[in-house]
Structures are given as structure tokens and as C-alpha cells.
Amino acid sequence: MSLSDTDKAVVKAIWAKISPKADEIGAEALARMLTVYPQTKTYFSHWADLSPGSGPVKKHGKTIMGAVGEAISKIDDLVGGLAALSELHAFKLRVDPANFKILSHNVIVVIAMLFPADFTPEVHVSVDKFFNNLALALSEKYR
């Protein structure tokens, strides 16, 4: 599903609004994923504390949202822009690519919770399309 110019503009606009809370969004989304989808904990078994609000969860949530921000800056070429990150997850971390969609869903849930007035149905559609394209780009090296 390709992103229209309107989708790209909407994603950039909502990112401008939410980016000051990106670290909080990332930490909450990761904590939700680890709670709701406990099978994802296997990728983080080296962390001593996987509980919501723990240092490792907050730190990785910040990393995740930093990557989302980077993806938005490369929105016209997600596959090329995220090639190194795709390679890392495919060959070194060996993350099942299905987890990209799981995490994306949780990020969307948190954005909707924290920004209910801004997260209109139109924004939801564009953000959902963006995260689907992001997940596909991150899955590129798995093929």
C-alpha cells in the first residue's frame, strides 16, 4: 500500500505534534507489547527487568521512536532508508518480522490514547498506512 502525498503530509504533521512525547510513546508501546504479547519477551531475555517503566524498556522505547522519526525523515524511500535496520533485525537480532506489525499496533494505540483530539480517523488511516509500509521496509532483508 503506497503512501499518497496527503498521507505523507499527515504523518509528518502528526509527528511534529507528538515528537516531544516520543520517548514516552515508545516506552509505553513497548511495555504494552511485552504485556499483551508475552512471546515477544524472548527477544529481550537479556534484560533483568521487563516491567513497564523499567530502565531497559524506557531506553529501548526511546530507540524505537528515534527510528520512527528517522523513517519519517526518509518517508519517500523507506526500503533504502531503513536497509541497515532491516539487516540488523534480520541477520543479527533474528526478530520475526511479524513483530514489527505488533509493535506498530501498540505505537498507534498509545498515540491515540495520548492525542485523542489529534488522532482523527483520517490521521489514523495515514499513520496505519505508514506503519504498514515501515514494517514492510524492515522486513525487506528477510526475503
Swiss-Prot record:
One of its GO terms (biological process) is hydrogen peroxide catabolic process. PROSITE patterns: GLOBIN. CDD domains: Hb-alpha-like (cd08927). One of its GO terms (cellular component) is haptoglobin-hemoglobin complex. Heme b binds at residue 89. Red blood cells. O2 binds at residue 60. The keyword Flavoprotein does not apply. Keywords: Acetylation, Heme, Iron, Metal-binding, Oxygen transport, Transport. GO terms for molecular function: heme binding; iron ion binding; oxygen binding; oxygen carrier activity. The modification N-acetylserine is found at residue 2. Residues 2-143 form the Globin domain. InterPro entries: Globin, Globin-like_sf, Globin/Proto, Hemoglobin_a-typ, Hemoglobin_oxygen_transport, Hemoglobin_pi. PANTHER family: ALPHA GLOBIN-LIKE-RELATED, HEMOGLOBIN FAMILY MEMBER. Belongs to the globin family. Heterotetramer of two alpha chains and two beta chains. Involved in oxygen transport from gills to the various peripheral tissues. This is Hemoglobin subunit alpha. It comes from Danio rerio (Zebrafish). The gene is hbaa1.
